[in-house]
A protein has these predicted regions:
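Phosphate/ribose-recognition catalytic cores of enzymes acting on nucleotide-derived substrates
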Residues: 1-171
């Protein structure tokens, strides 16, 4: 799997933009149920391939399911300290209302910016409030012209053989 040379993104995070493509797998089952904020999760195999310099934390960008419309997204990368996860995860909340789950679908994501580091929370309410603030901040950030351009990036229309996970950076 090729990983292209990294560059410094406009907001200072190395290795961005980061382009990810993989199958949506079942997560921990808490996004929709406990938090009311559904997420699409990448496989452990894909998570293990992300660049080491991508720190744990909350990111924003664009996402598309099964080559459908491109929507804003916010993504948590890390160990989710509140839940004391034993495995690193990438959980993508797509800012769009879907009528049903889409496990097994192909998810394409372009990670563009960093919002905050991963942290622990004292309560579930505090966690949900932080996630809602992340969603609002991501929504506002993606209205910037330099980020809006990525909504129509060729990555979202590339015809790539099914079943191939992709992690790549572009200069």
């Amino acid at each position: 799997m090729p990983v292209f040379p990294s560059k410094l993104s406009p907001n200072g995070v190395k290795c961005l933009p980061l382009f990810l493509r993989g199958t949506v797998v079942k997560g921990f089952g808490r996004g929709s149920k406990q938090l009311g904020i559904p997420t699409a999760n990448f496989s452990q195999e894909l998570v293990s391939k992300i660049p080491a310099e991508l720190d744990c934390g909350v990111y924003y960008g664009w996402a598309s399911v099964n080559d459908g419309p491109v929507n804003k997204m916010v993504m948590s990368v890390g160990w989710n300290p509140y839940y004391k996860n034993e495995k690193k995860s990438m959980e993508t909340h797509i800012m769009h209302k879907f009528d049903q789950d889409f496990y097994g679908a192909m998810l394409k994501v372009v990670v563009l910016g960093y919002l905050r580091p991963e942290k622990n929370f004292n309560s579930l309410d505090e966690l949900v409030s932080a996630i809602k603030a992340d969603i609002q901040n991501a929504d506002e950030s993606l209205n910037r012209e330099e980020w809006r351009l990525f909504k129509s990036h060729k990555f979202f229309t590339e015809n790539i053989a099914n079943g191939i996970d992709i992690v790549r950076q572009e200069t």
